[in-house]
UniProtKB/Swiss-Prot annotation:
GO terms for cellular component: cytosol; nucleus; plasma membrane. This is Nitric oxide synthase, inducible. Pfam families: FAD_binding_1, Flavodoxin_1, NAD_binding_1, NO_synthase. (6R)-L-erythro-5,6,7,8-tetrahydrobiopterin binds at R378, I459, W460, F473. A motif (DINNN-motif) lies at residues 23-27. It comes from Canis lupus familiaris (Dog).
Length: 1154
């Protein structure tokens, strides 16, 4: 029998000299011979291992053999180390683990091959005979030593017995078999040792499927199906590996021929183009040669090609239910869906070889989960892959013909945003590259502490975008191969010995693509001066993305003199307040004075905080609409709380009103805050700092910087609106409309029926919104056209150009599409909203009479402006009439007037009930000005809709309503609360429920409707339909609150809840896990919420804080739904900018502004 002891007791790492020095890996001084204490991890099948690499057997067994005792003795010398440094933070590590590396890498003395994709040193060639026993034995014993050294408690007898058993097995059979636990240990260690993997922090969580007993390709397929089902896990991806039988003589291999278990086909078309994934062209043709029938689509999943026991391969179609795919969409660009992109959720590498203890497993498919850039950069943007970069750039309106415009960078970022958004929307596991890089740095530090090294390939670990703004970029790394290890293999079809020559694929000449031969390292090292600057944290919370945009603009401003960091509130740790120097907050207010969704967590933690020891400086800017009574409420709450905690306010809080020039207000506040910060921080050279042009742009109008040129391009309204607003705009046509109010009412509420016969691909869910792009009134447009000077013909298409910053050339302005001035004023420009301060200041330049110019300048002051705006609420035409000496050019209008925004309406129909129609419920808005003495003003969209004739086009798009949708479980009870046009989405709810009952056999749970209006004979919208739904059992209860019944007290929806439904509401919410929906005016929603909280607090004996937490949980569980809108009538806005309570605060408002 061969002697194993010379391999077991080899202690080659004792050969180096030792000197006393600081242990940099653990950052503490240690006495000579001290070893790091091991970390523990979960045990593998009832026995625990160290996180450490193999250590000597511990001294827990008495009377060890002398030679074995030497193995455990404290080493008299410390291994030589390689020092590696992180150039970002200065931290250094000492790598000693590389002394256990196996073999040499690809580098030569005069040339580095580190950028070679598949170097020979990382590739295992096929064998035609078994590994000789004298080569296998030392590797086997070394692995057994490694395995038993990983236990927390030594198992000396078991260890020695296993060594003898392996030795005897090799001597008898020429090979040996791993135990199940050894296989699990080996696969995890191989992942831990993989230098090109950035996600190794999860190495200990790998699920191992032992498939070494299978013998046929069909059995292999069944194992892989099990693997796919487990790993996909409905989107909650789990890392897993399936290990097929080990290699014997190289002639009976079990292999998966696919590069990945799931991959899309690539078809070489007759004209030389490629349809699908170009990376799969060769393999796809192989599948076709084996008998697979191609589908010739862009995203066809290729079959699995499996080889068992060295036999010719067989192919198997993967069942569609095992292929989880994610359709791509963008959170802002609706047109991104038109690209019709998708990607599979599971990245499962299938063609690598596992080497462990001299054994080779050529079939071992494994998976983790995606890092976003793998799809968004490599799969979608690489020129040799789907290569969508230029198309996306063009759709974004970027200058794709100029490299210096950085269009590629901007486009690739948005593609990656789309990938992350799409995966997250579908609840599929994915990690962004910044988080992945951060997690690797934590893993690397842990590895150096636990085992003195971490093999890492810098070229592979630095993400393909973001470069030096990821921490791995600045980290020196040492690359080497340990055992166990995952090796590359030569493609199976290139080396397979065919038994049936008729099945051998014909050899084809493969066209070689142009390969990228070098990796360009861009970006400078981080400037050392940043470390000496004052740190500034900028937090934002947002629902629409506007606060984030402004926060990042603020970061750009403060980066001129400070060290800013911009974070979303849900990414911020409250404990960091104790370390802040300067904190800036930019946030919107959502709903009824609440925080945006991504600010809820911080709000709750901050408001529970009692005190701060760090008295930092802060400033807050709030965004909102003064049409809401809780204008900028969340920003004010944060301001007051920080002040209460003892923080020092740097500048007064700022407010940005969506109805009154929020961008100008933000710029003024930002510059004021920046100057104050420079003063308090004593910034050197603060008077010479050049701040971004955004904050220094001239507020004056210079007509020489703009010009109009004739254009021959006809206007495509849908395409133009799609590009301007980043929406997928389509055309519906008016079918009919009827007034839902009775003849005795002096108000109008329309049921608008739109035909979607020309847009049959239209899809929406009950509760979602229809965004409508209206046209301005013809009288307003004509009145402005009559007062314009220096104008082309009203119907002549033109486009706008602006002078470059240096004044040397003209640049096409893409703010508006090529169109006539008449078209611009009708469809693209807002001519009804009162002009902002900034626009009035520019108009003052154009007044030819001194008195008018002086009056306009006075109106730029906030107090005068607010009084004038609230009294007159002037349209742009009325401004021209009030100041007749104004000489306004077409260039001024096209460049300075604000963009006309879409109006949103809840869809009042079910797609299943009316597949060819979309219904809206629209209150036609008419209101007086100048305290009733001025002209009547009309809502833009509601008036436009009311004037349409049958078959007139309506440009629109569908907007998701978030969580405002029917429960996924139809057995959950619902209470629907919607006065006035707040009934709109609930009509779609009851139509959908009626359809499900009739056609799907579903019996939904109790649905209770609480409606409110003035009188039953005046404005009870959809009254007959409600009665029908009640009689058919769709609505189990209908309660109506009438607020204008003669001789009776006013009753509102909250009164119904308090007086008639208190017990039912509590039972539904607290016991039956039901859903409650509120739709309508923000003041009504506030009163309803207050009533509900009072009822719950009284019934459950909760404190004010407890009941707030109770409703916070309801919203978190997506069981309390709100779809609310602000005040509609401008005269209801107070001078201080907040919406006031009208004489009847509960009068139903129009659903959807104007």
């Amino acid at each position: 029998m061969a002697c194993p002891w010379k391999f077991l007791f080899r202690a080659k790492f004792h050969q180096y000299g030792m000197k006393e020095e600081k242990d940099i890996n653990n950052n503490v001084e240690k006495p000579p011979g001290a070893t790091p204490s091991p970390s523990t991890q979960d045990d593998l099948k009832n026995h625990k291992h160290h996180n450490d690499s193999p250590q000597p057997l511990t001294e827990t067994v008495q009377k060890l053999p002398e030679s074995l005792d030497k193995l455990h003795a404290t080493p008299l010398s410390r291994p030589q180390h390689v020092r590696i440094k992180n150039w970002g933070n200065g931290m250094t590590f000492q790598d000693t683990l590389h002394h256990k590396a196996k073999g040499d890498l690809a580098c030569k003395s005069k040339s580095c091959l580190g950028a070679i994709m598949n170097p020979k040193s990382l590739t295992r060639e096929p064998r035609d005979k078994p590994t000789p026993p004298d080569e296998l034995l030392p590797q086997a014993i070394e692995f057994v030593n490694q395995y038993y050294s990983s236990f927390k408690e030594a198992k000396i007898e078991e260890h020695l017995a296993r060594v003898e058993a392996v030795t005897k097995e090799i001597e008898t059979t020429g090979t040996y078999q791993l135990t199940g636990d050894e296989l699990i240990f080996a696969t995890k260690q191989a992942w831990r040792n993989a230098p090109r993997c950035i996600g190794r922090i999860q190495w200990s969580n790998l699920q191992v499927f032992d498939a070494r007993s299978c013998s046929t390709a069909k059995e292999m397929f069944e194992h892989i199906c099990r693997h796919l089902r487990y790993a996909s896990n409905n989107g909650n991806i789990r890392s897993a590996i399936t290990v097929f039988p080990q290699r014997t003589d190289g002639k009976h291999d079990f292999r998966v021929w696919n590069a990945q278990l799931i991959r899309y086909a690539g078809y070489q078309m007759p004209d030389g183009t490629i349809l699908g994934d170009p990376a799969s062209v060769e393999f796809t043709q192989l599948c076709i040669d084996l008998g697979w029938k191609p589908k010739y689509g862009r995203f066809d999943v290729v079959p699995l090609v499996l080889q068992a026991d060295g036999q010719d391969p067989e192919f198997f179609e993967i069942p569609p239910d095992l292929v989880l795919e994610v359709p791509m969409e963008h959170p802002k660009y609706e047109w991104f869906r038109e690209l019709e992109l998708k990607w599979y959720a599971l990245p499962a590498v299938a063609n690598m070889l596992l080497e462990v203890g001299g054994l080779e497993f050529p079939g071992c498919p494994f998976n983790g989960w995606y890092m976003g850039t793998e799809i968004g950069v490599r799969d979608f943007c690489d020129v040799q892959r789907y290569n969508i970069l230029e198309e996306v750039g063009r759709r974004m309106g970027l200058e794709t013909h100029k490299l210096a415009s950085l269009w590629k960078d901007r486009a690739v970022i948005e593609i990656n945003v789309a990938v992350l958004h799409s995966f997250q929307k579908q609840n599929v596991t994915i990690m962004d590259h910044h988080s992945a890089a951060e997690s690797f740095m934590k893993y690397m530090q842990s590895e150096y502490r636990s085992r003195g090294g971490c093999p890492a390939d810098w070229i592979w670990l630095v993400p393909p975008i973001s470069g030096s703004i990821t921490p791995v970029f600045h980290q020196e790394m040492l690359n080497y191969v340990l055992s166990p290890f995952y090796y590359y293999q030569v493609e199976a079809w290139k080396t397979h010995v065919w038994q049936d020559e008729k099945r051998r694929p014909q050899r084809r000449k493969i066209q070689l693509k142009v390969l990228v031969k070098a990796v360009l390292f861009a970006s400078m090292l981080m400037r050392k001066t940043m470390a000496s600057r004052v740190r500034v944290t900028i937090l934002f919370a947002t629902e629409t993305g506007k606060s984030e945009t402004l926060a990042r603009d603020l970061g750009a401003l403060f980066s001129c003199a400070f060290h800013p960091k911009v974070l979303c509130m849900d990414e911020y740790k409250l404990s960091h307040l104790e370390e802040e120097q300067l904190l800036l907050v930019v946030t919107s207010t959502f709903g009824n004075g609440d925080s945006p969704g991504n600010g809820e967590k911080l709000k709750k933690s901050l408001f529970m905080l009692k005190e701060l020891t760090n008295k930092f400086r802060y400033a807050v800017f709030g965004l909102g609409s003064s049409m809401y009574p809780q204008f900028c409420a969340f920003a004010h709450d944060i301001d007051h709380k920080l002040s209460h905690l003892g923080a020092s306010q740097l500048t007064p809080g700022g407010e940005g009103d969506e109805l009154n020039g929020k961008e100008e207000a933000f710029r003024c506040w930002a510059v004021q805050t920046f100057k104050a910060a420079c003063d308090t921080s004593d910034v050197r050279g603060k008077h010479c700092i050049q701040i971004p042009r955004l904050y220094t742009s001239n507020v004056t109008w210079d007509p020489h910087h703009y010009r109009l040129l004739q254009d021959s391009q006809p206007l495509d309204l849908n395409k133009a609106l799609s590009k301007m607003h980043a929406k997928n705009v389509f055309t519906l046509r008016l079918k009919s409309q009827r007034n839902l109010q009775s003849p005795i009412s002096n108000r109008t509420t329309l049921q608008v029926e739109l035909s979607c016969e020309d847009s049959q691909e239209l899809s929406y869910l009950p509760g979602e919104h229809l965004g409508v792009f209206p046209g301005n009134q013809l009288a307003l447009v004509q009145g402005i056209l009559e007062r314009v000077v220096y104008s082309p013909a009203p119907l002549q298409p033109v486009h706008l150009e602006t002078l470059s910053e240096r004044g040397s050339y003209w640049v096409r302005n893409n703010r508006l599409p090529p169109c006539s001035l008449s078209q611009a004023l009708t469809y693209f420009l807002d001519i009804t909203t009162p002009p902002t301060h900034l626009l009035l200041r520019k108009l003052a330049q154009l007044a030819h009479q001194y008195a008018e110019r002086h009056r306009l300048e006075i109106l730029c002051h906030p107090s005068e402006y607010n009084k004038w705006k609230l009294t007159n609420s002037p349209t742009f035409l009325e401004v021209l009439e009030e100041f007749p000496s104004l000489r306004v050019s077409a260039g001024f209008l096209l460049s300075q007037l604000p963009i006309l925004k879409p109006r949103y309406y809840s869809i009042s129909s079910s797609r299943d009930c009316t597949p060819m129609e979309v219904h809206l419920t629209v209150a036609v808005l008419v209101y007086p000005t100048r305290d009733g003495q001025g002209p009547l003003h009309h809502g833009v969209c509601s008036t436009w809709l009311s004037n349409l004739k049958p078959q007139d086009p309506v440009p629109c798009f569908v907007r998701s309503a978030g969580n405002f949708k029917l429960p996924e479980d139809p057995s959950r009870p619902c209470i629907l609360i919607g006065p006035g046009t707040g009934i709109a989405p609930f009509r779609s709810f009851w139509q959908q429920r009626l359809h499900d009952i009739k056609h799907k056999g579903l019996r939904g749970s109790r649905m209770t409707l609480v409606f409110g209006c003035r009188r039953p004979d005046e404005d009870h919208l959809y009254r007959e339909e409600m009665l029908e739904m009640a009689q058919s059992g769709v609505l189990h209860e209908v309660h109506t609150a009438y607020s204008r019944l003669p001789g009776q007290p006013k009753v509102y929806v909250q009164d119904i809840l308090r007086q008639q439904l208190a017990s039912q509401v509590l039972r539904m919410l607290h016991e039956e896990q039901g859903h409650l929906y509120v739709c309508g005016d923000v003041r009504m929603a506030r009163d309803v919420a207050h009533t509900l909280k009072h009822l719950v607090a009284a019934k459950l004996s909760l404190s004010e804080e407890q009941v707030e937490d109770y409703f916070f949980q309801l919203k978190s569980q997506k069981r309390y739904h709100e779809d609310i809108f602000g005040a509609v009538f401008p005269y209801e806005v107070k001078k201080d900018g907040a919406a006031k309570q009208p004489s009847d605060p509960r009068v139903p408002a129009a659903h959807g502004r104007s």
